[in-house]
């Protein structure tokens, strides 16, 4: 039997699949340690066991969120902030140390778009959080459009040949 989750999580255990992660094809690498996050020159990272701050002079320009094992200080997400302290983008990391997705936020803090990219940096999945639409671009195939996560997940299950008659 196969376990499938709809949420895109870069740290899913072996044997658990997500349609958002599956098509990206990441297979090797090590999770990123908090002080390995790329930051502009002269910015610094200050971390503790709960999270880390990215600082420009003394201004917070980002927050690094760890995976659920906080002692490890492995990067799950980086929220980037503008000069007013508003989050404008979140970078999502996987257990291979790669930034596999980027979410863009509106001025009022609402998620607008998430772009999922493969190991080569090619955009594979685009999720519009405003409309719910999802676009899937696979190499050598026509662009596929889904109205929502349910349609996308059904396609994923069919694409893998998973029997959908016994879903929980």
Tell me the role of every PLM-derived stretch.
Residues 15-63:
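Extended, small-residue-rich solenoid/repeat segments and analogous flexible loops
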Residues 1-36, 117-168:
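Long terminal segments
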Residues 45-150:
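Repetitive, compositionally biased segments used for assembly/scaffolding
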């Amino acid at each position: 039997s196969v376990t499938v989750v709809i949420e895109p999580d870069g740290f899913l255990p072996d044997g658990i699949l997500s349609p958002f992660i599956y098509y990206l094809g990441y297979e090797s690498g090590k999770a990123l340690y908090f002080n390995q996050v790329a930051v502009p020159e002269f910015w610094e990272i200050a971390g503790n066991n709960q999270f880390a701050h990215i600082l420009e002079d003394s201004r917070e320009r980002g927050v690094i969120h760890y995976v659920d094992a906080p002692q490890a200080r492995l990067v799950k997400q980086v929220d980037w902030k503008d000069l007013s302290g508003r989050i404008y983008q979140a970078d999502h990391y996987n257990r291979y140390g790669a930034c596999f997705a980027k979410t863009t936020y509106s001025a009022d803090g609402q998620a607008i778009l998430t772009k999922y990219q493969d190991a080569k940096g090619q955009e594979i999945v685009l999720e519009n959080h405003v409309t719910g639409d999802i676009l899937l671009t696979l190499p050598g195939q026509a662009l596929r459009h889904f109205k929502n996560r349910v349609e996308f997940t059904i396609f994923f299950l069919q694409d893998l040949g998973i029997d959908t008659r016994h879903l929980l």
